[in-house]
């Protein structure tokens, strides 16, 4: 049974469609813009009995622009985004078993908070006859905050990013690493 492992669960989904027409008054429309948005397509958030919290959100948006002037054309832009996160709080006051000292527990005077966020987004756009755009972005971020005592606390974070232009074949990647410590006297 899911109720034995999950303390709360939420699900959301929403769709919206709009059509905008423009042109000279009393004449046929020269431009029609149709937007279809799933904001969000899926949004699921769960709190687990273990203290872990997870969430996943996905959104999709499509814009179609039709020009009826002259030969006319139709351009389409589709964008999507996905995000997944996990958060876990570990009660370190009860002790944490370490791999290299399994018989002993390492105790802190507070909890350790761990987090992981993965995000992905993409854009695909086509404007006849030759213009087009196809890009995507990926980021992964992990964080940890801790407090060894009332006088010593800190945080650690690691991040990875990737940006790709699939139309011209260019990829950029980046890494970030951060470590902070706070001493109180």
Pin down the residues of each PLM region.
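Exposed, low-structure sequence patches enriched in small/polar residues
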Residues: 1-185
